[in-house]
Design a protein with these regions (language model features):
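A compositional/biophysical signature of low hydrophobicity enriched in polar/charged and small residues
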Residues: 1-94
Length: 94
């Protein structure tokens, strides 16, 4: 089983790019998006266990230079078009 979380990140305005690059290097972070709105970055976190979130988010992302604030959304269920395509293609490869 794995745990997925979406981390909304506010950064110091002049450190967004550097923070994004540093966050992508943290184990457990699979993707980082630069976004418009209240938050500057969105990180997708995928870890093996719930306890691992503490290592990645407050122990990693929140400590990155330029990160001012984070808000974490823990996923109950993951829906992905890519996962569904893989599921339904089993046995139909040519």
């Amino acid at each position: 089983m794995s745990v997925h979380a979406v981390v909304l990140i506010q950064c110091e305005i002049d450190e967004i790019s550097e923070a994004a690059e540093a966050i992508t290097d943290i184990e457990g972070v699979s993707e980082v998006y630069s976004v418009a709105g209240e938050f500057d970055l969105v990180a997708i976190v995928r870890v093996a266990e719930h306890d691992d979130l503490a290592k990645v988010i407050p122990g990693g992302i929140a400590k990155v230079d330029g990160v001012a604030r984070t808000e974490t959304l823990i996923a109950f269920q993951v829906y992905s078009k890519h996962d569904l395509e893989r599921l339904f293609s089993i046995g139909f490869e040519q």
